[in-house]
């Protein structure tokens, strides 16, 4: 089925930016943070000091204007023309399988957006044929890192970034 935003409108394929609003951590937005002594902040976190946070785009190579739950997606920060800020999942202690931004994207992204409760969860597929793994939150150092936590997804509502 079609993924819809908080206005009930279909989420667009790459054209629009959206805020991911966590259902259970409503006063936090997406931001970037460091893990350990990294030179640059590349880990995706929910930060209570960042609202509404960094907007994301959902991109599928399919020539269709809207996003459906069955589609493999790239999720990324930044403009659609750029390949920076693309989400991936990378093993990094002490977080585990952490969501981090990279400068490369595969044609078919490794994520799907799937209905969960009153919102949507992000599901990571390490391989096409494998079972998906829920993206949840790992709490460290006053931040909530997005990471694989299967069975404990973080549920988001998707709000179009132009709707202030």
UniProtKB/Swiss-Prot annotation:
What does the UniProt keyword field contain?
A: Protease inhibitor, Secreted, Serine protease inhibitor
**Source organism's superkingdom?**
Eukaryota
**Principal location class:** secreted
PANTHER family attached here? KUNITZ TRYPSIN INHIBITOR 2, KUNITZ TRYPSIN INHIBITOR 5
Protein location: Secreted
Q: What does this protein do?
A: Inhibits bovine trypsin, human plasma kallikrein and plasmin and weakly bovine chymotrypsin.
Write the signal peptide boundaries. Answer: none
Q: Which GO terms describe its cellular component?
A: extracellular region
Name this polypeptide is given: Kunitz-type serine protease inhibitor BbKI
The scientific name of the source species is: Bauhinia bauhinioides
Q: Which InterPro entries match?
A: Kunitz_inhibitor_STI-like_sf (IPR011065), Prot_inh_Kunz-lg (IPR002160)
UniProt GO MF annotations? serine-type endopeptidase inhibitor activity
């Amino acid at each position: 089925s079609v993924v819809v935003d908080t206005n009930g409108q279909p989420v667009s394929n790459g054209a629009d930016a959206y805020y991911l609003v966590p259902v259970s951590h409503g006063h936090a937005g997406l931001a970037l943070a460091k893990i350990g002594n990294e030179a640059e902040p590349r880990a995706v976190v929910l930060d209570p000091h960042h609202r509404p946070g960094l907007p994301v785009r959902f991109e599928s190579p399919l020539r269709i204007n809207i996003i459906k739950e069955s589609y493999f997606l790239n999720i990324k920060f930044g403009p659609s023309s750029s390949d920076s800020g693309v989400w991936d999942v990378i093993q990094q202690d002490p977080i585990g399988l952490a969501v981090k931004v990279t400068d490369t994207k595969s044609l078919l992204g490794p994520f799907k957006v799937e209905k969960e409760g009153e919102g949507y969860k992000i599901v990571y597929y390490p391989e096409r044929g494998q079972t998906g793994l829920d993206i949840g939150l790992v709490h460290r150092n006053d931040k909530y890192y997005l990471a694989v936590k299967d069975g404990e997804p973080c549920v988001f509502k998707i709000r179009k970034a132009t709707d202030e």
